[in-house]
Amino acid sequence: LRKTTVEWFYRWVGFSVANGKHKWIIDIYNRITPLPANHMMLYTEPWCAATVSALGERLNLTEYIYPECSCNRMIALYQKNGRWEERDDYKPQIGDLCFYDWQDNRVGECTGEADHVGMVCDVSGNTFKVLEGNYSNEVKSRAMQIDGKYIRGFGLPNYAKAAIGYKVPVDKTNIRTMAGQVPYLNIDNNNEAVKMAKILFNSLGFNAGTDTIFDE
């Protein structure tokens, strides 16, 4: 489930304020029920926490990826549920949330106010990568050092519990969202078109396979 969640996040890479696709993320966030802090987000607000929350909403995982539009209120939820890791030298797993404090002075454990959040998408040796919404106004990744500067701590969604009987929910709104992005398929379409179609169908919860051969 960790891998599935991260793979879904990768589909949003490149969504930005410039191309307007960040609005799609915020729209998903605003359909969370009940809406955190009873606050409907505007498209002009910071949207890093809303991005990981929207991911949880899209995958029906809000019981484990606690939704919030505030980084600090999100931290409080992980602390309350015993899913918080304070240590900067913690080696994260993919799917964990990394919180940042840009005022970190590297004196002891960072316990300041959180300014930003993303989801760990890769771990290799003493480094890890984090996928983030609202990173320079778009969704993209950042490389970090374990026990590095600016780490406020980690939120640890309980994927083991969430995975029991889990299936990715079908969201028919994605058909409208992605309409026009996938070419119509004919017998003579090339394999790339087929691959794009399979990505769409797999994203909707269907098993369209992974090969790119279009059989008659």
Locate predicted features.
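N-terminal capping segments
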Residues: L1-L61, V168-I187
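...with weaker cross-activation on analogous glycine-rich loops/strands in unrelated enzymes
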Residues: R2-K3, L61-N137
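Residues at secondary-structure transition points
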Residues: L42-P46, R87-D89, I213
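A short macromolecule-binding patch
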Residues: E138-D147
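Low-complexity, Gly/Ser/Thr/Pro-rich intrinsically disordered linker/tail segments
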Residues: D147-R176
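Short acidic, glycine/serine/threonine-rich helix-capping segments at coil-helix boundaries
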Residues: Y184-E216
